[in-house]
Amino acid sequence: MNPLQLLQPLPAEIKGTKLLAHWDSGATITCIPESFLEDEQPIKKTLIKTIHGEKQQNVYYVTFKVKGRKVEAEVIASPYEYILLSPTDVPWLTQQPLQLTILVPLQEYQEKILSKTALPEDQKQQLKTLFVKYDNLWQHWENQVGHRKIRPHNIATGDYPPRPQKQYPINPKAKPSIQIVIDDLLKQGVLTPQNSTMNTPVYPVPKPDGRWRMVLDYREVNKTIPLTAAQNQHSAGILATIVRQKYKTTLDLANGFWAHPITPESYWLTAFTWQGKQYCWTRLPQGFLNSPALFTADVVDLLKEIPNVQVYVDDIYLSHDDPKEHVQQLEKVFQILLQAGYVVSLKKSEIGQKTVEFLGFNITKEGRGLTDTFKTKLLNITPPKDLKQLQSILGLLNFARNFIPNFAELVQPLYNLIASAKGKYIEWSEENTKQLNMVIEALNTASNLEERLPEQRLVIKVNTSPSAGYVRYYNETGKKPIMYLNYVFSKAELKFSMLEKLLTTMHKALIKAMDLAMGQEILVYSPIVSMTKIQKTPLPERKALPIRWITWMTYLEDPRIQFHYDKTLPELKHIPDVYTSSQSPVKHPSQYEGVFYTDGSAIKSPDPTKSNNAGMGIVHATYKPEYQVLNQWSIPLGNHTAQMAEIAAVEFACKKALKIPGPVLVITDSFYVAESANKELPYWKSNGFVNNKKKPLKHISKWKSIAECLSMKPDITIQHEKGISLQIPVFILKGNALADKLATQGSYVVNCNTKKPNLDAELDQLLQGHYIKGYPKQYTYFLEDGKVKVSRPEGVKIIPPQSDRQKIVLQAHNLAHTGREATLLKIANLYWWPNMRKDVVKQLGRCQQCLITNASNKASGPILRPDRPQKPFDKFFIDYIGPLPPSQGYLYVLVVVDGMTGFTWLYPTKAPSTSATVKSLNVLTSIAIPKVIHSDQGAAFTSSTFAEWAKERGIHLEFSTPYHPQSGSKVERKNSDIKRLLTKLLVGRPTKWYDLLPVVQLALNNTYSPVLKYTPHQLLFGIDSNTPFANQDTLDLTREEELSLLQEIRTSLYHPSTPPASSRSWSPVVGQLVQERVARPASLRPRWHKPSTVLKVLNPRTVVILDHLGNNRTVSIDNLKPTSHQNGTTNDTATMDHLEKNE
């Protein structure tokens, strides 16, 4: 509109009343006569500024018309009788042609659609006219956004606000594309520069055309947002129910989410940072939890009156048989979308075609199939190099899982790689490549699937194999499947009978069928002749839990489901009869090298505190060829059940069978034991010996032992034979009868069985009166309650066997990991034996937890006194102090100390960098170049740049050992002096230290050393500086006298001798086991690393070790302690490895 026309009154209408409106360029909000707002509810309050001052006013959200065009906006009450319009509410009044960055070739897209359409010529011309008529509907620019005039969405959070997130590193190639998007959205008001307490990282995603899509990671925000109850229908359900008529159209709404406004109170949640500046969304952002549901609900509501339309997020599908009707309905859709404020992308749209692409599939009149684009992606798949690539490939394959009947079985080996992956690495083999190619070939040759006809009943055909179930869905009159379903049985389901596996598959099929039935009956065809008869399946034949059987049986009562037996599917008939069981033919015992007959028995115990007395009997026999008993055992077991006795007898026989070469037969009369050993034991072993309720099995130790024996000797056969029966062979009857007799004897003698004391040879001789070294003769030794005891002055003590002494010490020590004396006193309460203290010390030295936690009980050797350089400037010690409080832009101070004189130079720097170090030392080396520079291992001193600088000047670099400041004690001492002096001089003004550095340097260089009795200035120049308290006699000396005095001072320097070594000190040797101190141990964490080997001794106080990470490191012995076990003791570091995992 011409700007002059804006000065004229504009026709308006509100609530059916016509009035005038005036465009006000200075208005920030539209003003409505207050009489029209009496029945409205305010949505908030806002502060209004006018020439008369500021005032809080109610804000309303109303709908009115301007020049016949609908306007929805926030307004306030006005005392005038006309409307004052804010320019932001009617932007179309002054609308200029949109100018963004990248122009879309719209004409090219329209010609492409017209060339591919299947519409007759008349309708094609009508479509061409529609392109011109609705030009404002099409997307002319990339990143062009519509403007949906609806009440803004409010993004509500839960009880806790989201936490701001850091920005990820961004690929530099993505920055130009993202910058274009942000610039275009700023021009359209979709983004606004605004600071926020929230931040979401930008995550650019590459597009196929080489550009990048701007995606925001809103996962942290989504955690705090309540999920909208109304959610989108699943794409599979839409594909199964869409109308497939002759002419089909798909429309793509461009940037649909960005057309929906949000309330200003929600802006802060959407904030992100780009190029150091923060932006917020004024529209519904992509990636927000409820964006798809809110957007789809709006589009569905707009198009609800249009027949044969289906909406999935920003994709619109419609289909009709009549071309005229199709074009008429298309125009209605165009008109609705334009009035609503949406923009349509013709690049991704297909109009009036017989086959269109919708939701990733080719949609035809008969059904759906895989697109050429998808098949091309399959052919471009290469073997994955890591876990992420494998998951991406499986995600792509899973998209088409319903197109082949055995998809789950084909991809199962690939999914197994995910479970066995080590971090992000996978073990990909040639077999995996073949399997992947097999899946790709099957998908590329897959046929189209038929559409679901809602007026027909749904047919399900079910089949099963030992490892998987197969399902096909049909329309009642259909010839092609609607979809396939393949289900791989779990470990628990693999143990089911074939009938139960078929019922499991049927259950999975019916869950999916409820979505596909669309209110129609479901016809299930299976190899089961009569579903009602399966209820009579005997309990011993049921492997599944009762709850599963209850679920399966409920389908019999569902009136929507009918079960049929399909005679046309012979491959589905072969299911084992659940009423019969197959048994392997019994071999004659002469075919085995040995035969064990086992039995268990239990009687009621006469002891009221016990329930049973159990015993087991085992007979070892052979047939050469006659029956001959080689050995027999009758063993009491105590208070146990007969079942436990049966299992223990089989375990005993299996252990004895390990010593026999060749096949061995173990016969038991317990059906439970034989069936469990032959059928259930492999599953128990694989799942950790737990039952279906994930609880440990009864008698788990026995079953583990039997499983171990069977794995060590696979030719052990465990066979069930009934007890005393006329139906069993005579050669088995004899062995069973004897084993039963022995088991009964064991159960009866258990009460009078006396346990023999556990004595070794030493204690046995002691009881016989022989003199044993270490046992005093004056004490009395006797046997009581199966234990050897000694009567000592402090009381009666138990003497344990030698094999038990280590366990006793460890048990006493592990209670609280006490020291030698505390552990010894605890043991001495009950026990005594010779050399008890020595055994305690030995075991404590092997406690891994104490080794890495206790402090060292040995001191390192005396401190080495490094030789003082003979001349000034031979050796410099350098280090950084800081960070200090900012002072004129400086934060750090480089300290340089001369090794011979202690003379100090101070250089302020802004950072402890290599460049700052080199710059400062270049000033100093203009006076003299040192031979050696000693420093710690900071980054500024160990960089290649600093090493190159030193090499060019012939300077040797020397470094302190880590975590050992004593190595650079000269400069460390100066650092403490500098900090102390600065603190005292800067009380109340810590940021003024830069100006005081010359004063501090002068003070340090003229301070007397209590040891040397001279100042650094005197040691360097031979005379005092011109400062207070200076020796005035030296100021008048001639140059010859100064040099003579300087030589006298330097030759008289006091060289302290090395102090003598402590009696508790230690010296390192090559090959010695030592433990390195943890630099900064966390609370309740070990203070020492696991033992390492000394590889080289550089000097009495510095060594090279192979550290706990496998690296050679130079360390000071001040940070080491010798390991307790050195000679002949195994360096078992398993415990310490476990404890150091999280260091």
From Swiss-Prot:
Active site per database record: 24 (for protease activity)
Catalytic activity: Endonucleolytic cleavage to 5'-phosphomonoester; DNA(n) + a 2'-deoxyribonucleoside 5'-triphosphate = DNA(n+1) + diphosphate
Cofactor comment text: Binds 2 magnesium ions for reverse transcriptase polymerase activity.
Binding site for Mg(2+) 3: 874, 936
Gene behind the chain: pol
Protein name per Swiss-Prot or TrEMBL: Pro-Pol polyprotein
GO MF assignments: aspartic-type endopeptidase activity; DNA-directed DNA polymerase activity; metal ion binding; RNA binding; RNA-directed DNA polymerase activity; RNA-DNA hybrid ribonuclease activity
Effect in UniProt of substituting residue 152 to G: No effect on RT or RNase H activities
Domain (Peptidase A9) ranges: 1-143
Record site: Cleavage: 596-597, 751-752
